[in-house]
Amino acid sequence: MTPSVPRASGAPPGGYRGSGNRSGPAYQPAFGAADRLGPPSRPESPRLRLTAAVWLAVWELARMLPESLVFGVADLGGRLAHRVSVRARARVARNLARVLPAATDAELSRAVRGAFRSYARYWVEAFRAADLDPADLDARTTTDGFAHLDAALEGGRGVVVLLAHHGSWDVAGRWAETHGYHLAVVVEVLRPRRLFERFVRLREAFGVEVVPLRRRGASGSEVGGPLGGGLQRVAAANHMIGLLADRDMSRTGVEVSLFGESAPLPRGPVVLSQRTGAPIVPITMLQRPGRRWHLQVLPAVDVDGLAPQAAVARVARALEQLVLLDPVQWHCFSPVWTADRPPRQRRSHAAPAPT
């Protein structure tokens, strides 16, 4: 049974403002995204089906075993993956070298190893997110910067939450829903489909609305396209829309400077903000020692009236600030910068906007 999202009234837990309008009808989330997708366009291979079965088995073990054991095994797995995954290790090193240009070789090596350990922890936390007791989650979480988010919501036009593959974003969604902040997230439809659908149901189980995005490699994959109506409905109800913005998966992004080097970034946050009037607010859930977290909200990004190039460049500055909160927690296991992408994935862009 999926939760409902009532009209905001009074103070949510902890005195946070919460999202939603103070008057008018209750918002009805569009849960059941996995059921509306329909079957995959082509049958999945036996290898993909086996991959799904293995991941789902690991998922169940992560939920069933004692917390200390699960996190200990995950940390060991992250260390092992760092040792044996030569290609991934090199890719993470290239990415983090841009973020930490002054790091020595030894410092960069430690950061890369830490990135693998952080990523392993992310997966365990995602698997266990729906089982987190709200009171326990609250006790383990500190927050900062919520004045930025609450001020943005006072405008009544929703908020575009600027996310990166950083920290533990599924735990952030769980925390948000237990404190009166309703979140809809745009996620790309991935294979194996069975595993993707499990993640959709996980997020919906604790109240996060999932908006699936099919990769098309054209303007149809942008949030300003076919998805726009559903997302605008969320914004009109003064709720939050989460968009991962540190990777251009559609190949229709805008080339801007990111940590001093050219990289394509998605235009979705800018398109949605300019169409709805919803401010862009960067947020991350930082992992802390002892299985604790810190939820950090950064100042809103003003893109009102800016051309796409300048607007996405401004978003890039916000992403830099977010990543620099703890570069080790940036799960940058894919090519980000243009120089690292295969030629077939590159396209002609305008010159990077000035910072």
Regions found by a protein language model. Name each.
Residues 2-7, 14-17, 22-27, 31, ...:
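Non-catalytic C-terminal accessory region of glycerolipid acyltransferases
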Residues 3-7, 12-163, 196-201, 207, ...:
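Membrane-anchoring hydrophobic helices of lipid-metabolizing enzymes
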Residues 54, 88, 168, 195, ...:
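Residue-level preference for nonpolar/small residues embedded in alpha-helices
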Residues 57, 91, 147, 171, ...:
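Short Gly/charged-rich anion-binding patches and loops
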Residues 73, 108-109, 187, 214, ...:
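Short loop/turn and capping residues at structural boundaries
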Residues 139-142, 165-166, 192, 217-225, ...:
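A conditional alpha-helix N-cap/helix-loop micro-motif detector
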Residues 155-218, 248-254, 258, 287:
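Catalytic core of membrane glycerolipid acyltransferases/transacylases, capturing the structured
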